[in-house]
Swiss-Prot record:
Its main location: membrane. Cell wall formation. Catalyzes the transfer of a GlcNAc subunit on undecaprenyl-pyrophosphoryl-MurNAc-pentapeptide (lipid intermediate I) to form undecaprenyl-pyrophosphoryl-MurNAc-(pentapeptide)GlcNAc (lipid intermediate II). This is UDP-N-acetylglucosamine--N-acetylmuramyl-(pentapeptide) pyrophosphoryl-undecaprenol N-acetylglucosamine transferase. It comes from the Bacteria. SUPFAM superfamilies: UDP-Glycosyltransferase/glycogen phosphorylase. Pfam families: Glyco_tran_28_C (PF04101), Glyco_transf_28 (PF03033). The keyword ATP-binding does not apply. Its EC number is 2.4.1.227. One of its GO terms (biological process) is regulation of cell shape. It is found in: Cell inner membrane. It catalyses: di-trans,octa-cis-undecaprenyl diphospho-N-acetyl-alpha-D-muramoyl-L-alanyl-D-glutamyl-meso-2,6-diaminopimeloyl-D-alanyl-D-alanine + UDP-N-acetyl-alpha-D-glucosamine = di-trans,octa-cis-undecaprenyl diphospho-[N-acetyl-alpha-D-glucosaminyl-(1->4)]-N-acetyl-alpha-D-muramoyl-L-alanyl-D-glutamyl-meso-2,6-diaminopimeloyl-D-alanyl-D-alanine + UDP + H(+). UDP-N-acetyl-alpha-D-glucosamine binds at residues 15-17, 127, 163, 191, 244, 263-268, 288.
């Protein structure tokens, strides 16, 4: 008699910080014979990305309420109830053995639907402070996991699943051993770029002329404007692009990173073993600040919050990072990483089925 094939439904959507870790766990369990489906929304990145990975996806209609008007707020209970009913139909039709909530608005109705159908819920919080949806779902979840300490008081710290290509990078001492010349600084503001980085870094390049060489991801639609800023500062030799397809290659090239502090970015920088200057996005719960705090406490990174992110301040920090300092910081970053995060999450998913 053959063992029953186990079924996982991943609930994640909206941003790469939710979707890519979910894909990592999905592929890991699929390699062990699991069947995997996805619960998402039809108008966000998961709608196209997940099927490209050979995973079927079901959709519910749900969106966030932050920043919406009074009418949207008043209609919210109806829309949440409708999404919950849609998710329950999907759960009953496919009958997963366990669901994994990796974040995004879809996780709320999806998690409630699974719980109401008697399906165990495993919850993974990617950020250093838990959002409203996950704080609610934690109360009904079989297991709660967190990437960084402090999001939940008693949850296991398992890290964030990151791409295999990043985990495969050589150790910092091997990458940095023979490097000379200008310090290589990678500037990334996420796939959409970050205006504060685009406005500040061309002048930093001029202030530290000859000391730095930059690879700057500016985000969609900002290329012409940022190229003009570099030209106005007499710094046209730097590599300026809208989007970087191969982040592992970019991390391998870099000596240091200047970036936002999204959960997946922080985890990838630690896994790669790179010093970082973090500029957290100004969110009311300071989510990105708490993501970056662990690496700053490990003396592997520096945080400059956006109101203080000036040409002078950034230049002073980067000018103080010589090659021996960068190597020490890189080694501390990699020591703070959790490289087996994918396996840890997958084990907890499997354990929830057996419990």
């Amino acid at each position: 008699m053959t063992a029953k094939t186990r079924r996982l439904m991943v609930m994640a959507g909206g941003t790469g910080g939710h979707v890519f870790p979910g894909l990592a766990v999905a592929h890991h369990l699929m390699a062990q014979g699991w069947q995997v489906r996805w619960l998402g929304t039809a108008n966000r990145m998961e709608a196209d990305l997940v099927p490209q990975h050979g995973i079927d996806i079901d959709f519910i209609r749900i969106s966030g309420l932050r920043g919406k008007g009074l009418k949207a707020q008043l209609l919210a209970p109806v829309r949440i109830w409708r999404a919950l009913r849609q998710a329950r139909r999907i759960m009953r039709a496919w009958r997963p053995d366990v669901v994994l909530g990796m974040g995004g608005y879809v996780s709320g109705p999806g998690g409630l639907a699974a719980w109401s159908c008697g399906i165990p819920v495993v919850l993974h919080e990617q950020n250093g402070i838990a959002g409203l949806t996950n704080r609610g779902l934690a109360k009904i979840s079989r297991k709660v996991l967190q990437a960084f300490p402090g999001a939940f008081p008693h949850a296991d710290v398992v890290g964030n699943p990151v791409r295999d290509a990043v985990l495969a990078l050589p150790a910092p001492e091997a990458r940095f051993r023979d490097r000379t010349g200008p310090i290589r600084v990678l500037i990334i503001g996420g796939s959409q770029g970050a205006r504060v980085l685009n406005q500040t870094m061309p002048a930093v390049a001029a202030r530290l002329a000859g000391i730095l060489t930059l690879w700057h991801q500016v985000g969609k639609g900002a290329l012409e404007e940022v190229n003009r800023a570099y030209a106005a500062n007499g710094e046209t030799q730097h590599k300026v692009v809208e989007f970087i397809d191969d982040m592992a290659a970019a991390y391998a090239w870099a000596d240091a990173v200047v970036c936002r502090a999204g959960a997946l970015t922080v985890s990838e920088i630690a896994a790669a073993g790179l010093p970082a200057l973090f500029v957290p996005f100004m969110h009311k719960d300071r989510q990105q600040y708490w993501n970056a705090r662990l690496l700053e406490q490990a003396c592997a990174a520096k945080i400059i919050e956006q109101p203080a992110f000036s040409v002078e301040r950034v230049s002073d920090v980067l000018a103080g990072w010589d090659r021996p300092t960068l190597l020490t910081m890189a080694q501390r970053a990699r020591a703070a990483a959790i490289p087996d995060a994918t396996e840890r999450v997958a084990r907890e998913v499997a354990a929830a089925v057996r419990a």
